[in-house]
């Protein structure tokens, strides 16, 4: 992919790489992964503006870059992942006011124990008809029951990829039961 710098060059590299790997000439839905700007990553609460965060591409320039790939036929629709109500509202507003392509989907976490999507994203998603593509529907496998009573299946995500322990802490495990 093209990294997390959403300009025409890096988006083009990412799209072309995906087209090659998928052995196709177009992508039905191309999604941006993570906002460029600093935001509440990984469930962090209490957003604070980082005045040192550096440059990131404006929402409008991102939509203009994506528009070129829609017009060229490389992608049909666009969406994003891990976005906030602020980010989605900016994209929607610019799409309407500047006749730019609109975000059709947002891919955020949502499951029985992580329902933060309902706080702000659900309203704008429903009102603006921006579909939700859920990730972590089973809370990285914790809701499947395979980690009960301290079990750690050999080839499970938790065994293979360290750093996801926050989903298996004692308080979370009580909620899964």
PLM regions: where:
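Short amphipathic alpha-helices and their capping/turn segments at secondary-structure boundaries
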Residues: 11-26, 120-129
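Beta/alpha (TIM)-barrel catalytic core signal, keyed to glycine-rich beta->alpha loops juxtaposed to Asp/Glu
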Residues: 35-177
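Active-site mouth loops of central-metabolism enzymes
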Residues: 1-12, 49-57
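Acidic/hydrophobic-patterned starts of short beta strands in beta-sheet-rich repeat architectures
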Residues: 29-30
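Short, acidic/polar
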Residues: 6-22, 59-64, 88-93
């Amino acid at each position: 992919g093209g990294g997390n710098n959403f300009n025409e060059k890096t988006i083009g590299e990412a799209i072309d790489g995906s087209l090659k790997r998928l052995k196709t000439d177009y992508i039905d839905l191309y999604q941006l992964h993570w906002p460029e700007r600093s935001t509440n990553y990984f469930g962090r609460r209490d957003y604070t503006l980082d005045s040192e965060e550096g440059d990131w591409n404006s929402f409008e320039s991102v939509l203009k870059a994506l528009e070129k790939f829609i017009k060229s036929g490389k992608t049909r629709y666009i969406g994003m992942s891990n976005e906030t109500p602020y980010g989605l509202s900016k994209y929607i507003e610019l799409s309407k006011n500047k006749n730019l392509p609109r975000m059709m989907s947002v891919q955020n976490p949502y499951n029985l124990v992580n329902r933060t999507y309902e706080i702000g994203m659900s309203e704008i998603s429903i009102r603006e008809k921006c579909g939700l593509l859920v990730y972590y529907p089973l809370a990285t496998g914790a809701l499947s029951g395979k980690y009960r009573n301290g079990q750690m299946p050999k080839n499970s995500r938790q065994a293979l990829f360290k750093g996801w322990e926050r989903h298996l802490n004692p308080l979370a495990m009580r909620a899964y039961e």
